[in-house]
């Protein structure tokens, strides 16, 4: 009989990994068998070179370029980690010209970014007030509808299970282009609006179908299931698509808009625990485009304008 597979190393994040205390913490964690995500301002800076020279670093240490005020970069560093050691904080040696921006904001806001960066799971719900105030009616409707399911199920002793997907992409079976596919076509064809460089949480439509059947067939399934296995920034997605399909116009993206905004990863661990195995994001994007190429949806039509679906209007960059 084959020996059992070794358990994966516990994974943690250390912010400010190149600092005095953090460096020793990284060294200790590596010696105890941890896989470490260390954030540094510049992984190529020689002042951080000592980290990759630590015992075990080649196998178990990953450096992430991240400032404590860049919540999107922090989210990427924290993704997949069981815990976070928030050590990063400015320690000025000289007289401070602007204490508020040089010390207070990085220390306090940076800490808040870490706390708010806790991955969102099934315990988290969309905020009704935020949805209503920003006229995000679809999200509001889905939130209220799901709350209604749970209220009804509790009162009537109904065995209910809900699956909550994010942006759904992938090839279609129906001929009419659906709303989320319109978003992808808008990105590729190059609509008139500039998009924010925000994170997109994406799931393949085929994986959503798998998830729905999985929770139905598994007797142990219960409660809510987040269905959001992948995320990518708008800028990174454009770079990925342009390399493979360089002949399209593509929408413009306002770089670095996501910096200092609250970006929190969404996790689908509960669904994965049931045996759900979603596709890689690259497969979803490429299969989506190949479908639209074959069906002619990517062909330019004279006089046709490409609109951003209203449900995604918050993806649009504000006019300066």
Predicted features by range, described:
Residues 3-4, 184-193, 198-225:
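Alpha-helical substrate-binding/gating segment
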Residues 125, 129-161:
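Active-site Tyr-X1-5-Lys
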Residues 90-93, 118-136, 173, 188:
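Active-site "gating" loop of Rossmann-like NAD(P)-dependent oxidoreductase/epimerase domains
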Residues 211-261, 289-292, 296-320:
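Mid/C-terminal beta-alpha module of Rossmann-like enzyme folds, strongest
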Residues 155-158, 170-183, 215-225:
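Glycine/proline-rich active-site loop of Rossmann-fold NAD(P)-dependent oxidoreductases
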Residues 239, 257-277:
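Conserved C-terminal active-site "lid" loop/helix of NAD(P)H-dependent oxidoreductases
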Residues 43-109:
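NAD(P)H-binding glycine-rich loop region in Rossmannoid oxidoreductase-like domains
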Residues 2-36:
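N-terminal Rossmann NAD(P)H-binding glycine-rich loop of SDR-like oxidoreductase domains
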């Amino acid at each position: 009989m084959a020996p059992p597979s070794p358990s994966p190393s516990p994974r943690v994040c250390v912010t400010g990994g190149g600092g005095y205390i953090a460096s020793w913490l990284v060294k200790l964690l590596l010696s105890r068998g941890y896989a470490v995500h260390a954030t540094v301002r510049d992984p190529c800076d020689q002042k951080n070179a000592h980290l990759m020279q630590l015992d075990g670093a080649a196998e178990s240490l990953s450096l992430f370029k991240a400032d404590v005020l860049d919540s999107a970069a922090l989210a990427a560093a924290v993704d997949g980690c069981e815990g976070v050691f928030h050590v990063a904080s400015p320690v000025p040696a000289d007289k401070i010209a602007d204490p508020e921006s040089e010390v207070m904001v990085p220390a306090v806001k940076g800490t808040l970014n870490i706390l708010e960066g806790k991955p969102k799971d099934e315990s988290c719900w969309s905020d009704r007030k935020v949805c209503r105030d920003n006229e995000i009616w679809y999200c509001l409707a889905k939130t209220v509808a799901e709350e209604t399911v749970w209220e009804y199920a509790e009162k009537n002793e109904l065995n209910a299970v809900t699956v909550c997907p994010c942006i759904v992409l992938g090839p279609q079976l129906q001929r009419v282009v659906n709303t989320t596919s319109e978003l992808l076509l808008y990105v590729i064809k190059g609509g008139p609006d500039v998009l924010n460089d925000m994170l997109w949480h994406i799931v393949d439509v085929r994986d959503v179908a798998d998830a729905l059947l999985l929770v139905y067939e598994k007797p142990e399934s219960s409660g809510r299931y987040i269905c959001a296995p992948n995320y990518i920034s708008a800028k990174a997605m454009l770079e990925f698509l342009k390399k493979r399909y360089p002949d399209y116009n593509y929408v413009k993206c306002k770089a670095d808009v996501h910096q200092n905004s609250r970006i929190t990863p969404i996790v689908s661990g509960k669904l994965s625990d049931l045996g759900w195995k979603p596709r890689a994001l690259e497969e979803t994007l490429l299969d989506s485009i190949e479908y639209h190429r074959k069906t002619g949806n990517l062909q330019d039509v004279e006089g046709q304008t490409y609109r951003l679906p209203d449900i995604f209007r918050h993806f649009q960059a504000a006019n300066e």
